[in-house]
Amino acid sequence: MTVSTAQMRFWSPEVRELEPYVPGEQPKIQNLLKLNTNENPYPPSPKVVEAVQAVLHEQADALRLYPDPDATALKQAIAKQQNIDVSQVFVGNGSDEVLAHIFKAFFLQDEPILYPDITYSFYPVYSQFFGTKTKEIPLNESFEIDVRDYTQPNGGVIITNPNAPTSIALSLAEIEQVLQANPDRVVVIDEAYVDFGAESAVSLINRYENLVVCQTTSKSRSLAGLRVGFAIAQSHLIAALEAVKNSFNSYPIDRFAIAAAVASFEDQAYFEEQCQKVITSREKLVRDLTELGFNVLPSKANFIFATHSQHDAGQLAQKLREQGIIVRYFNKPRINQFLRITVGTDEQNARLVQTLKQDIL
C-alpha cells in the first residue's frame, strides 16, 4: 500500500521511521513447491487434529468465553516435557511475540545489546521499535560466532541457535561462556530450530539466572498456523515477561491453539519421529546439492544455506521460481550469494534437485 506524505501526518514520528519486518512470501501458485519459510513438510500429530476437533465439537459453547489468560494447561505440558517447573514457562502468540516481550522486558539498557550481523532479521526491527541501542557483531569468515566477541560491555545479548539464516549451531560450552561473561545482563538464546540436531540451552536454566531460552511450535511441531511460542527461564525473569504481556494483551493464545499445542507436547513419539525424518532428508539433500557443485554450510536446522561458485544466487532463485519452486534469497551484504532452502519431504527435495540438474545448472 502506498501512503502519501500528507496522509503520513497522522502517523507518530516513531512509526514514520520504522522499517518493518518483511515476512517470507506466501504466494498463491498452483503446484508450488514452497521451500522459503522453513515450515515443516509434515502435518502435526493426529492427536493435535483430534484436540482441535474436540474444542469445536465438544466445547463450542466455551468459545463465547475468554481463554485461560495464563494458558495453564499449556504451561504444564511444556514444563512436563522439558522437565522444569511451571513457574519457569512463559507462553505467547508465536515466538515473535515472545521475543518482542523479551526486548521490552530486558533490553532497555544504557548500553547496546549485542547480536550477530547475520541473524534473524526481526531483531533490528524490535530494536528500532523499542528504541534499543544495538551493536552487530560480525560472524567470522566461516559464518560462525566467536563467543569472545560477546564479552564486551553490553545491555544484553541475543543469539539465534542454530543461527538463522546460516543454520550453524553453537555448543552448550560456547553458550556457557557467553552467560558467564555477562552475569548482570540477560542472555537470550533463540532456539526456533534447535530440535533438528542442535543442543538446547534449557538444561542450563537452573544454573544461570540471566538466561532466557525462546522456542516455538511452528517448526518442529508443525503448528506455524496456530501461533504458539514460549520462553523458559528462572521465575524472576518469567515474572517480568508476564508483566509486559499483561500490559499489552492478557489473552494472547486462543482455545484452539492451547488445545493443539498441549496435544503436540503430549505426543513426544510423533514429534521425535518427524524431527528425525527432517534430519535424514536434510543430510541427503546436502549430499545431492554438494554433488551439483553447491557449498552447503553445516546445518543443525530444518533448512540449509547454500552457495554455488558458478551461479549467481539471485538468478538461481528467479530460475527456480519460474519452475514453481520458491526458496529464500537475501539481497544483503555477505550473504547475497547464498540461498536458504527449507528441507522438504524426500519427494520435494528430489524435485528441487532434478530441477536444478535438468533445467538450471
Swiss-Prot record:
Q: Which reaction does it catalyse?
A: L-histidinol phosphate + 2-oxoglutarate = 3-(imidazol-4-yl)-2-oxopropyl phosphate + L-glutamate
The prosthetic group or cofactor this protein requires is: pyridoxal 5'-phosphate
Q: What is its EC number?
A: 2.6.1.9
Keyword check for Magnesium, yes or no: no
Kindly list the positions at which N6-(pyridoxal phosphate)lysine occurs in this protein: 219
Key words of the record: Amino-acid biosynthesis, Aminotransferase, Histidine biosynthesis, Pyridoxal phosphate, Transferase
Q: Name one Pfam family in it.
A: Aminotran_1_2
* One GO molecular-function entry: histidinol-phosphate transaminase activity
The answer to whether UniProt assigns keyword Amino-acid biosynthesis to this entry is: yes
Pathway where it operates: Amino-acid biosynthesis; L-histidine biosynthesis; L-histidine from 5-phospho-alpha-D-ribose 1-diphosphate: step 7/9
Cited CDD domains: AAT_like
Q: Which residues form a coiled coil?
A: none
- What biological process terms from GO does the record include? L-histidine biosynthetic process
- UniProt record similarity statement: Belongs to the class-II pyridoxal-phosphate-dependent aminotransferase family. Histidinol-phosphate aminotransferase subfamily.
User: What PANTHER family does the database record attribute to this sequence?
Assistant: HISTIDINOL-PHOSPHATE AMINOTRANSFERASE, HISTIDINOL-PHOSPHATE AMINOTRANSFERASE 2
How is the quaternary structure described?
Homodimer.
Name by which UniProt lists this protein: Histidinol-phosphate aminotransferase
Q: What organism is recorded for this protein?
A: Acinetobacter baumannii (strain AB307-0294)
The organism's taxonomic lineage, starting at the top: Bacteria, Pseudomonadati, Pseudomonadota, Gammaproteobacteria, Moraxellales
